[in-house]
Amino acid sequence: MADRFSTNLKAILVMEDLSSGSFQFSQQDCLTIQDFHYCCNRGKNDEGIVGGVTGSSMMSMTVRLHELSENKRFYDGLISRSPSPFTILFNAEFGNDGKLKDYENAMTVFGYIVDVQEHFSTLVSQDKANAPMSIHIDIQLTKMVFHGKDSSKTLDIIHTDE
């Protein structure tokens, strides 16, 4: 894994499963994450001791779009009947060929897209680097896999009707 090369974390999104082993993509396949948050929780028994399964959880994410056509994959996920993979790579490094060279840490989440909101800015940017389009998605999580430097840890999320 990469050594920390920045005090500011940079996160990118790839809609593939890093834990599958066949993780090949280029820098063009990545989207910049502006922000994301999620909350996982577990229940307590009658004595107040935490235990049991991790309950149903949501993740919200805002992603910068470089082209309007990039929103299609999120709308495809919205109508899909199976969970989609979303891999978040922190401080990724790419080689001169544009292929992934290294990354610091990563997290792959699986889930159903339940809400999509597009945001457009009326500000005109002189340089094309700051695209005025972003998309906000809400994902009902089914599984999370944390990819650390030494190993991966899986958190299965059980949906309950509570």
Show the residue positions of the predicted features.
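Glycine-rich, low-complexity intrinsically disordered segments
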Residues: 1-162
